[in-house]
Regions:
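Alpha4 helix (beta4-alpha4-beta5 surface) of REC/receiver domains from two-component response regulators
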Residues: 15-19, 72-73, 96-113, 117, ...
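His-Asp phosphorelay/catalytic-motif detector in bacterial-type signaling
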Residues: 1, 26-27, 55-59, 83-88
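Acidic, metal-coordinating helix/loop segments flanking the phosphotransfer/catalytic sites
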Residues: 16-18, 22, 31-59, 123
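Conserved alpha-helical interface elements of two-component signaling phosphotransfer modules
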Residues: 11-15, 82
Length: 140
């Protein structure tokens, strides 16, 4: 089963995220998806993912600036569906815009993290978030 779903279109940020998770033994089963439409298909077991069992990821790390369907819409659909509402979603984005933060929380995001520009701090932020959501947090 997928533990972490990483929805990120930037290959460098995705690699840094996975490296930070791996170095903290949190990356046993990470699935990386590069656009919002594919992320929704994955979560809701549609299209190319229709054969997936309905085992939901334990954590979704979601960028906001995504091709095809943006992160806000992905968040809206996940949090408005009874089957997926309880999945912890952490926005991990370069956007520190107030409207993105407010809208994300209005839609039910569990955490909103702005990507640090410094590589070392980026890795630290991801590792701490992964540690909290995968090991410390108790989800239903």
């Amino acid at each position: 089963s997928v533990e972490i779903l990483l929805v990120e279109d930037n290959p460098t940020d995705a690699e840094l995220t996975m490296r930070a998770l791996r170095s903290n033994n949190l990356a046993n089963n990470v699935t990386w998806i590069k656009n919002g439409a594919e992320a929704l298909d994955f979560v809701f077991c549609r299209g190319a993912y229709s054969s997936r069992k309905n085992d939901h990821p334990k954590l979704i790390l979601l960028d906001l600036k995504l091709p095809k369907v943006n992160g806000i819409e992905v968040l809206r659909q996940i949090k408005s569906d009874e089957r997926t509402r309880a999945i912890p979603v952490v926005v991990l984005t370069s956007s520190a815009e107030e409207r993105d933060i407010v809208e994300s929380y209005r839609l039910g995001v569990n955490s909103y993290l702005v990507k640090p520009v410094d590589f070392e701090h980026f890795g630290e932020t991801v590792a701490k978030a992964g540690f909290y959501w995968m090991l410390m947090n108790k989800a239903p």
